[in-house]
Amino acid sequence: VTPGRHHVVAGVLVRGATVLLGHRSPDRRWCPDVWDLPGGHVEPGEDEPAALARELQEEVGVVPRDPVLLTRFEGDELVLSLWVVRAWDGEPRNRQPHEHDALRWVGAADLSGLRLAHPAYVEVVHRLVEFGNAAPPGE
């Protein structure tokens, strides 16, 4: 965890050629009324995989198996780490309707019509769909 910056993890749950997005409720303080990946803040003393597992369990009721770090965005106030999750225990469902008012499996073609929390999500989903369920080259 980087002092002075918000440290956030998000899970990119991949099912076929789609990823799971949650629509943030319009009354949320941060990033209201946009589509976002499930995840949240890393707590003090917690590593990213533990934070990811906790947040995915809290928000969508799944326990990730073998998540892989995809990318990390670092800004002055925020560190955002995206983890690819291709396997999990449980069936995704909205466990925090006060945070997300809807969940949806979204393909790359569907992204252009959605307001996204982070513009990089478009590239992330396109890359994942391009690789399909195969590991990136070199793995």
Spans of model-derived segments:
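A short coil-to-beta-strand element that immediately follows conserved catalytic motifs
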Residues: 62-72
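Conserved Nudix-box catalytic region and its N-terminal flanking loop in Nudix hydrolases
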Residues: 18-58
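A short beta-loop-beta micro-motif enriched in histidine and acidic residues
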Residues: 8, 31, 76, 98-100
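Conserved N-terminal beta-strand and adjoining loop/helix that marks the start
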Residues: 1-20
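Active-site-adjacent beta-strand/loop module that shapes the phosphate/pyrophosphate-binding cleft
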Residues: 71-93, 102-109, 124-129
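Charged phosphate-binding loop/patch that engages nucleotide di/tri-phosphates or the phosphate backbone
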Residues: 117-139
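C-terminal structural segments of small proteins and small subunits
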Residues: 111-114
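Short, charged/polar surface micro-motifs in flexible loops or helix N-caps
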Residues: 14-19, 26-28, 43, 76-77, ...
